[in-house]
Amino acid sequence: MLFLNAKFIDLDLGANAVIVNEEDLKGTSYYPQDRVLIESHSGSVLGILYSTKTMVQKGEVGIPVRKMKGISLKEGEEVNLRHAEKPESIQFIKKKMDGQVLSPNEIRTIIDEIVSKKLSNIELAAFVTSTYVNGMNMEEIVEMTKRMAETGDMISWEKSLVVDIHSIGGVPGNKYALLSIPILAAAGITIPKTSSRAITSPAGTADVMEVLTNVELDEEELKRVVKATNGCLVWGGGVNLAPADDIIINVERPVSIDPQPQLLASVMAKKVATGIKYAVIDIPVGKGVKIKNEAEGAKLARKFIELGELLNIRVECVLTYGGQPLGRAIGPALEAKEALEALTDPKSAPKSLIEKAISLAGILLELGGSAQIGDGQKLAWEILESGRALEKFNQIIVEQGGTPKKPEEIELGKYVEEVRSPIDGYIVGINNTSITNVVKEAGAPRDKKAGLLLNAKIGNKVKRGDILYTIYSGSEERLNSAVNLARRVYPVNVEGMMIERISKF
């Protein structure tokens, strides 16, 4: 056992990290990454041990303030450190790494220990990798989904019909929800939209909406907003919905993987937790997104529908074109601006954005009884064109704590680089992966003002010197790095009509 004095530090290492000077560890049985219990007169909390030469002095233990829930300490107070038992779920993670099927109890134990932060980031990464490599059967996914929902807030509603739209993501600029949700809410349909922050894309719905208003609402605030407006657009982590999901996402994000079992459970756990009865799942298909072809998309759709049936949620899936970005704007601020422009003047907005938004909203208008089968898309367009969707969107912004803005009032990164066409020709390809990587290199999604604006899309004719796209960043260094990356990965591909001249055989 070690006796040390608590020192509060502002550092987030993911798990409940505790930091000890390496001099205090010499000659002991304590090693970095050991699991330890921090004990004081007020209680105890589990932590993962890290060592340092300079961050804390000999005789101190560094405790990240934001992570030490469950214990009340004063700085300088003496605490005890002792070895903690290894989590039970470690053996079950190894079992999944070996490709075996997990029992319901084993899955519940893993999720419980993720939520209680008994697992280190390394152990979490092992679990995520095991499901990425070996997958899960439907029984495992159902159990994981239920437990992910049960370990967080479970929201109930006065209305019996509550709906949701969700995209599995992967498409840069996928901002459809900022149009679809206010369309549905304006029609009187209850749609409490909760979403994750970006995992593999440069901006999630929550990242984009955060440019315009507060997205971190608790359960009571969320219910108040929905009661006032019929809808909301908030971050699921702020409401404590399926808390294991955001912990897992933080492990997935650095390596840009989203294992299908986690994808299914992540999406549907939040539907269970928010009391959803009808859900439309958008599955983008195309080069550079998660689902490469229609056959693969149909297979995933069947899994979503089956999982929904087992959870008593009616699910319809839509395969959408994902071969290039949705609209022209990629990155939180740029996407928020484009969404506002589309709500303000839908006739001038990118057709791909409008078509996707009203198509998805139209399905739920039909399922919810607001429109006859086949008339949903028409009604969605009428609500959008009339200005009712913009009015509802601004109402949601206000209720969530923001102030409505005009598109031109949204600030973009002050460091800008225009990339021009080297030849006369046509846009023959836009690489989603390259676009995503360039925008991330520019600083998105953490830098809300970072992004990329496409001046041309596939099939457009361009002349030499025309602007192909513009990169924005809040950092000159990040902008230069993004531009250098763009020169290597060619986000936009231009080709002339003449491929090669051949005069001899």
Swiss-Prot record:
Its lineage opens with:
Archaea, Methanobacteriati, Methanobacteriota, Methanomada group, Methanococci
Q: What does this protein do?
A: Catalyzes the conversion of AMP and phosphate to adenine and ribose 1,5-bisphosphate (R15P). Exhibits phosphorylase activity toward CMP and UMP in addition to AMP. Functions in an archaeal AMP degradation pathway, together with R15P isomerase and RubisCO.
Q: Please give the name of this protein.
A: AMP phosphorylase
Q: Which UniProt keywords apply?
A: Glycosyltransferase, Transferase
Binding of AMP occurs at 170, 196-201, 205, 266, 290
Q: Which GO terms describe its molecular function?
A: 1,4-alpha-oligoglucan phosphorylase activity; AMP binding; pentosyltransferase activity
Positions of the catalytic residues: 258 (proton donor)
Question: What is the native source organism of this protein?
Answer: Methanococcus vannielii (strain ATCC 35089 / DSM 1224 / JCM 13029 / OCM 148 / SB)
Looking up SUPFAM superfamilies in the UniProt record yields:
Nucleoside phosphorylase/phosphoribosyltransferase catalytic domain, Nucleoside phosphorylase/phosphoribosyltransferase N-terminal domain, Pyrimidine nucleoside phosphorylase C-terminal domain
Q: Which domain of life is it from?
A: Archaea
